[in-house]
Amino acid sequence: MAAAIFAKVSPRARVFALVTLAALAASGVVVIGVFATRSDVPSPKLRPGRPPLALDLGVRTDAGARALERAQTLYNRGRPRQAGEIFARQPSLEGQVGAALAAWPDRSLARLQALAAGHPRSALVALHLGLALYWSHRDAEAAAAWRIAAAAQPDTPYAVRASDFLHPRFAPGLPVFSPSFSTPLRIRVLPPERQVAVLAHAAATGGAHAKILYGAALQHLGRPRSAEAQFAAAARLAPDDPDARAAAAVGLFDKDDPSRAFSRLGPLIRTFPHAQTVRFHLGLLLLWMAQVKQARTELRLARAQNPATPLGKQASAYLAVLRSVGTR
């Protein structure tokens, strides 16, 4: 569970994994773990270890969410039996998925298949069914389950994660829009659940910048479709605002069809030739696709426009990490 929606994180820490993956992928190196190597050769053996568990509880702080977080932490630390004991006491769908994987491989796949039959439109279930199928060397069925997860509930973090496995050459997750203006301090100091509520109210009653801030928060929460709607509304309200127009373009990014975002973002270079946000986010999207050479060019241009701004500093951080992983 995130400590805060807009928590202060070192730019280098935030971008290192993304840039490393992009740089290595551009060099032809497979870097996204086991999911980058597809094989449909039947095998009686399971893959080593156990499938990952990817419960996302957003900003929930209720007792059930805290229990699920504890269980997931135990699972991730290699203590599935203790995790399973906690999951077994949680009647939620998250608890049932966790309990099935904690018992791996003892009937885990069958239990997840039963959950999928009972909840055919649950991205949570389809994602983890795909992971169990993949660990069982049933790769084509795993990909089919991930496609269901991505399509059934596209406005969820589980759909975003499923798309990661379907597109292993892309950086994980989706690019998040970084406004050139700051979130007010009065919002940043609030607990995460209050941040979201305040941002939602401001977006409903305020102007383009309020909608952009809420859209960025929704992106952080794994709700890309809702974020896209907020960004589009901001662009309609303020068509001459480069932040609003760039956000609307970034919100369209889809690993199945990246051209939707690029076709909107690229022309903004001519519309707003001095807007740092356009160059920066063009570089970000290129980096997400492991187009390192082109990304570096755009990030350098963004930094040159003003290295002292938050976006200029982020561009510098990306470029520094690119240098540290051996790209020029």
Predicted regions and their residues:
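Start-of-helix register in tetratricopeptide repeats
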Residues: 65, 94, 124, 157-161, ...
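Register position in tetratricopeptide repeats
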Residues: 76, 101, 105, 135-136, ...
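Alpha-helical adaptor scaffolds
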Residues: 88, 92-118, 182-189, 207-274
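Residue-level recognition of tetratricopeptide repeat
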Residues: 72, 97-101, 131, 216, ...
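Short coil turns that delineate tetratricopeptide repeat
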Residues: 61, 120, 154-157, 204-207, ...
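Canonical tetratricopeptide repeat
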Residues: 98, 128, 161-165, 213, ...
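Terminal, low-structured helical/coil segments at or just beyond the last alpha-helical repeat
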Residues: 158-197, 201, 296-328
